[in-house]
C-alpha cells in the first residue's frame, strides 16, 4: 500500500480490473497484479514450511498483515459502505490478515470474534494474538491488550475505534481548560 503502482510497464500486469476506475485503471491493474503475485509467493512459502514440518517436525507460524488500505483507496472505493466518517476511517485503515501454521494451533478460538463476522483487529492486537495462538507466554501488557480486544478490537491512529459489536466512534480529547 506504500508502493508506487505505476512503476512497471502496463504489459507486465497479469490482472486487469473489471471495473472502470477512470484515471486509476493503470494503478489498479498494477496493484491487483502485485496482490496476485504476492498470493502465489505466500502459497509457495507455506508449501515450503509444510514440507519442512513433514521432514523435520520444525514448527513455523507465519503472520501477514497490512496496516491500511492503499493511498488511492479514497478515489476508487465506494464510500456508501460506511455510514459514518468513523466507520469510513475504520474501513480505510483495515486490511486482511492471516495467521498460518504448518502444525495445529491450540488456541485459535481466542482469535476469533463471536460478534464481528469480519474478525477485525488492529495492528497492536496482532502480536499478542499471534503469541496467544502459539501458546507462548504473554507479558502483562499483551495480556492487557487481549483483554481490551474483547471490548475494543480496533483503534486507529486517527482516534477512531470500533467496539466489539462493529459499531464505531471517535475518541474525544479535552484539554485541561475545557474541564
Feature locations, PLM:
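Solvent-exposed soluble domains appended to multi-pass membrane proteins
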Residues: 1-179
Amino acid at each position: 500500500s506504500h508502493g508506487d503502482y505505476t512503476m512497471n510497464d502496463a504489459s507486465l500486469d497479469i490482472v486487469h480490473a473489471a471495473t472502470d476506475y477512470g484515471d486509476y485503471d493503470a494503478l489498479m491493474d498494477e496493484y491487483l497484479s502485485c496482490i496476485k503475485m504476492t498470493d502465489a509467493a505466500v502459497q509457495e512459502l507455506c508449501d515450503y514450511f509444510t514440507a519442512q514440518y513433514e521432514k523435520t517436525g520444525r514448527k513455523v507460524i507465519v503472520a501477514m498483515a497490512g496496516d491500511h488500505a492503499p493511498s488511492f483507496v479514497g478515489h476508487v472505493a465506494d464510500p456508501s459502505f460506511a455510514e459514518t466518517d468513523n466507520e469510513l476511517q475504520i474501513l480505510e485503515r483495515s486490511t486482511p490478515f492471516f495467521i498460518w501454521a504448518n502444525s495445529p494451533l491450540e488456541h485459535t478460538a481466542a482469535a476469533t470474534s463471536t460478534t464481528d463476522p469480519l474478525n477485525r483487529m488492529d495492528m497492536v492486537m496482532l502480536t499478542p494474538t499471534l503469541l496467544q495462538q502459539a501458546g507462548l507466554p504473554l507479558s502483562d501488557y499483551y495480556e492487557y491488550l487481549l483483554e481490551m480486544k474483547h471490548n475494543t478490537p480496533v483503534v486507529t491512529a486517527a482516534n477512531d475505534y470500533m467496539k466489539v459489536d462493529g459499531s464505531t466512534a471517535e475518541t474525544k480529547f479535552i484539554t485541561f481548560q475545557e474541564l
